């Protein structure tokens, strides 16, 4: 009593306290960062190594394996995967959530250093690492195009000037430059001309290497001067290499131009990038795992004018893709939803109280509680994101509930003629414990979420803490500011209501009277209600088992990502044509705004595409509907597939795949894996629950297998080293010399001119100069035949691995797909030597599925413990918790009705319902106990009176919560796919709960009261608590 009086009778202090809370909240709001979701990125580091010309199997055994053994010993590595292809190896390390990325980077560097002595000596550079996840979609893509500069020159500008500058911006983890390669002098040799002149490829390589040398020459001094010595020992351009003498034949000089075509070109001609059908260089920017995407994008945009000034005017630098506009639009939609929810909740209060003066009180209490929460969010290091803003939206209903309970009870005393200050004090005292019970039990619901580990726990923590803080501040405001305002603002008389609202008042009275009559009937037929209650419990179990489930709602971020997978024997020229064909199909779609893509590099038969869709208000279809429409058109392209998926804000794992979900096959027997992977993939491709099934196992690439006759080689005076060097010189785009420039270093690349390697007969033109100086054709000591060979070799840990990726067809859920895959693996009878497991997001879904029921039970148990402590009773908490089954049925039925799978967002809705619907029972039980203690009423009379007296606040709080969640259901625009499952769950649960709990709660109350009397040692005492 004294606590409440302290604030009621000191209005200035109470107002200033509320002002202080509001000001702190405003300050916190201004400093809060903006993000799509809470920070849930796993720390990921990518290690890259190269050995030009080495086969995938060689890269896997000689480069990947030594690095994996060293890297696998790092503390905190949760997953290690690698992929080795022609000349390159990439190892992805995913660390535990609590692992500091910078500390992990230091350990990675130490592990690379430890493995260095085990790596091949011919590697052009040491392995490097990047603190970025290559499977993440870029947060921004910049393109460089020009009508005057070559692709190599554009790539040089991008990699030398732009990428290093962008990499230094806070939050940027990696800038990947694609679409071409650095400028280079390319030497295309003519095998026949070399044979005619008696010049070997090694002779050419040695001559070029010796002619382009950068060595110190020293200085010359006399008594008074000093001169640095400088020579023309370097060759910079193709024109300077052309006249280089490489050999003498019969006294005549053989120049490089006589036996080769020398051009200013690029290091790797098997690269291509495009934007909207125009050749382009792409800068794909990814953020650090812990970085804020909006802040990083804003920093890049602020730097762009400065970057524009560093490149020539003839080069066009454009933003081809930017993830931030849809994120900002989504957050704006949530903010609008929050404002609408507050307005609707205040409207509900006004309709029930029918007093503008009374309505002002919750209209002040709600903003103070919500704004004050921003200060706590800032102190906790949170951000303004979809989940935290949704928490505030839902908190509006909880916040106003506390104010309603206090306000309605004070208003009831005022209508009975009590003086305002006395009514404020008396009314607050009566419901103070009720408000405390509702708030503490509601916060208790989220305690298991705070203790939940892994990605789901990290994702839900901000939601739970934000909501809990809002409830805590609301509790303080409701017991201080609200009663003070009631005492000083309201009058001791019935409020004057407007004529147009009298009808609503009469309707409410009629509804209350009708409820009283029906309640009397129910209390005389309690067995029927008991059957209904048991039925809802059983229905909950059945609905939960049968409802489709997924991890997170499929988002429409306005960005699509596509992976191209072509025939494994396709040439680069044909692959570039496929890229152009696919880009044209997509660019012609009316919902597409921009298309960029690239192909080439170490994997000639693959490519990537990034598609920006038009804003949501300019298209009628969702991203998934657009994908479904494009899938049919793309399927008509022969010899290649383009797998599209909508970019999501949450992507787990470091695997680069062509679809959203992954299923990984592991085996210590590579032959068994290669035998069973095609069988499993083909089986999964027939399942209706899966779409776009594809695999990263590519072991059917075309290979030309050369077999040396070692005896013949020995007789001819040729060793294997010379023969291998011949092949590398001819076909390996061998980098044989370095050109040093002030801003960068460039290579001299030697190979047989592509004009002479159009078919297999090119091998017949190759020859080696033996130790006697004779030209020996390759065909004299080697035979060759076509064969199959892997284009890539993949590992997970130290086991051979193959990852099957898949998307979900429209109308299918991840639980449907998971169950179908498990059935297929059982039907196939896959041996124990091949192990299958879900990976990435699908793996997290499996883990979440296993913990969902435990989490709900833990929340209910926590609420029971808190209520039991508050009521000093084992029984009354059960009465209060009896409201939950009906809410669960309503929520699950609503999800089924709206065709929405049960996701992590729906789980939040269920947890919220545990907190919301028990409020009705708390208000009934509190007043019933009070009536039994002080009114000398029987349990049936007490609960009946409590139900009627609390009917108005119960209706008010329920409708406030209902109207609070309704904008989430009805919201459209960006991010609505995240908000709708939460709103659907809450609205469905509230509607069903309100219909049933007004009757089941009094029945359960009486049931437990009779049960207690039956087993009580003091049968005359009806209420002991």
UniProtKB/Swiss-Prot annotation:
GO terms for molecular function: xenobiotic transmembrane transporter activity. It is a multi-pass membrane protein. It comes from the Bacteria. The keyword Transport applies. The chain crosses the membrane at residues 3-23, 333-353, 360-380, 387-407, 431-451, 463-483, 528-548, 853-873, 875-895, 897-917, 953-973, 984-1004. SUPFAM superfamilies: Multidrug efflux transporter AcrB pore domain, PN1, PN2, PC1 and PC2 subdomains, Multidrug efflux transporter AcrB TolC docking domain, DN and DC subdomains, Multidrug efflux transporter AcrB transmembrane domain. Keywords: Cell inner membrane, Cell membrane, Membrane, Transmembrane, Transmembrane helix, Transport. It is found in: Cell inner membrane. Coiled coil: none annotated. It holds the Pfam family ACR_tran. One of its GO terms (cellular component) is plasma membrane. Belongs to the resistance-nodulation-cell division (RND) (TC 2.A.6) family. MdtC subfamily. PANTHER family: MULTIDRUG RESISTANCE PROTEIN MDTC, PTHR32063. Part of a tripartite efflux system composed of MdtA, MdtB and MdtC. MdtC forms a heteromultimer with MdtB. This is Multidrug resistance protein MdtC. It comes from Shigella boydii serotype 18 (strain CDC 3083-94 / BS512). The gene is mdtC.
